[in-house]
Amino acid sequence: MATTATCTRFTDDYQLFEELGKGAFSVVRRCVKKTSTQEYAAKIINTKKLSARDHQKLEREARICRLLKHPNIVRLHDSISEEGFHYLVFDLVTGGELFEDIVAREYYSEADASHCIHQILESVNHIHQHDIVHRDLKPENLLLASKCKGAAVKLADFGLAIEVQGEQQAWFGFAGTPGYLSPEVLRKDPYGKPVDIWACGVILYILLVGYPPFWDEDQHKLYQQIKAGAYDFPSPEWDTVTPEAKNLINQMLTINPAKRITADQALKHPWVCQRSTVASMMHRQETVECLRKFNARRKLKGAILTTMLVSRNFSAAKSLLNKKSDGGVKKRKSSSSVHLMPQSNNKNSLVSPAQEPAPLQTAMEPQTTVVHNATDGIKGSTESCNTTTEDEDLKVRKQEIIKITEQLIEAINNGDFEAYTKICDPGLTSFEPEALGNLVEGMDFHKFYFENLLSKNSKPIHTTILNPHVHVIGEDAACIAYIRLTQYIDGQGRPRTSQSEETRVWHRRDGKWLNVHYHCSGAPAAPLQ
């Protein structure tokens, strides 16, 4: 929208300091208001790279956050648009994640878990009173106001939150984090406020024993468990939990959303409002130990996803945050060829990166937030829930990564080490079958294969790239994951095919993309003859 003068209110009123977190199109930095010296966290969104739909989502997030003023919610203090950037000024919360704080405590009891869920329910009740559904309640979004003992729990990240009409149920799209999704969302039924209560039930279960009620490495099996409400209270860890706590979990994890307890009702449950007499005060050391392992798994898997972005079921997976690639068959004049196959339509497994980081944290959930709908809560659209409109600039950058990856593979097929080195960083790191599981750094290891095998190969090689998934990481980094089929003629003149699952991390320096890390599983990419 055209304006006569450029707004500089954020620049005038606030001073920026160190970075606290970063996303694809946003960065979070500590800032201080010049007139009061009060500290805040500024989420800075690069609006030049946002599509019209992303602008709608940004406006919705700001609109929702402006409504919510509660001691257990990270508060939005200001929303400012300047030329090319939008600033969301939030509370600066310094206590870290609730779950990380619990494992550092010397004493933790059922009563403490009750106090935690009480605060979470207070925040959920407040947003539900304002006809808001969070849709992404999980440990990463439960923060502590400070590092002081007894600091308030704060609910963060309203990037997936939606506005609803009272108790009315509707289909707002498939969004959330797998382990915390409700049965009605998985069934693609109309849903509403009860989805947040289901997630609270999962969180409460973890708070009491340190592990989740539903878990399976196979996401399809995980979803089957959730839809069936297949959880229990196994011995011995649940033997010391009071019946009242189990009763509240059962009411929260009720499959039928119409019969599920509400936030207001849960706040009146004896285990919550009469914790001093109902909840056990016994120290739960086993829970702390299990929760420590649970946190470690979350961080480890989050780190792996952040750097590798590869699915265990890669050939069946479909990242529905990415539209189908536009590339067709790429024919080369050389003896090698690279053929790009667009993404599969297989819907058995879904792997998606988090669409937006929490405004005040950087940790990622191992079961990352997934969004598979076109409207993402913008009501009135009849578009398919399996498509997403992407920013045009983002599409162009993804195509750039696919193209440069094809060029690199063509250089390998042609045995052209000079062309290969121009596309790779001199300090390229790699995990590949030829290195027997060792991390290789630099070009010498690869040079051996170029000089002794690839450059001497006169037989044709044809490569097909299947299901390329490109993830843009900030302005100058990207990751591509794909399956590579290599067809070649062996020493006896027989046609052969080898398959490998590959990931390449790219970094742009001085306007040029360089491959900085490579990960390969399966058969060697360069077939031995």
Curated annotation (Swiss-Prot):
Record region (Autoinhibitory domain)? 283-292
Q: Which residue ranges does the record assign to the Protein kinase domain?
A: 14-272
Give the intrachain disulfide bonds: none
Question: Which residues constitute the catalytic centre?
Answer: 136 (proton acceptor)
Q: Which residues carry this modification: Phosphothreonine?
A: 287, 306-307
SMART domains in the record = S_TKc
What's in the keyword line of the UniProt record? ATP-binding, Calmodulin-binding, Developmental protein, Differentiation, Kinase, Membrane, Neurogenesis, Nucleotide-binding, Phosphoprotein, Sarcoplasmic reticulum, Serine/threonine-protein kinase, Transferase
Chain spans, region Calmodulin-binding: 294-316
**What is the reaction catalyzed?**
L-seryl-[protein] + ATP = O-phospho-L-seryl-[protein] + ADP + H(+); L-threonyl-[protein] + ATP = O-phospho-L-threonyl-[protein] + ADP + H(+)
Matching PROSITE patterns, A to Z? PROTEIN_KINASE_ATP (PS00107), PROTEIN_KINASE_DOM (PS50011), PROTEIN_KINASE_ST (PS00108)
Q: How is its activity regulated?
A: Activated by Ca(2+)/calmodulin. Binding of calmodulin results in conformational change that relieves intrasteric autoinhibition and allows autophosphorylation of Thr-287 which turns the kinase in a constitutively active form and confers to the kinase a Ca(2+)-independent activity.
Q: List, alphabetically, the GO terms of the cellular component aspect.
A: postsynaptic density; sarcoplasmic reticulum membrane
Q: Its family?
A: Belongs to the protein kinase superfamily. CAMK Ser/Thr protein kinase family. CaMK subfamily.
Task: Read off the domain note.
Answer: The CAMK2 protein kinases contain a unique C-terminal subunit association domain responsible for oligomerization.
Oligomeric and partner information = CAMK2 is composed of 4 different chains: alpha (CAMK2A), beta (CAMK2B), gamma (CAMK2G), and delta (CAMK2D). The different isoforms assemble into homo- or heteromultimeric holoenzymes composed of 12 subunits with two hexameric rings stacked one on top of the other.
Q: What name has this protein been given in UniProt?
A: Calcium/calmodulin-dependent protein kinase type II subunit gamma
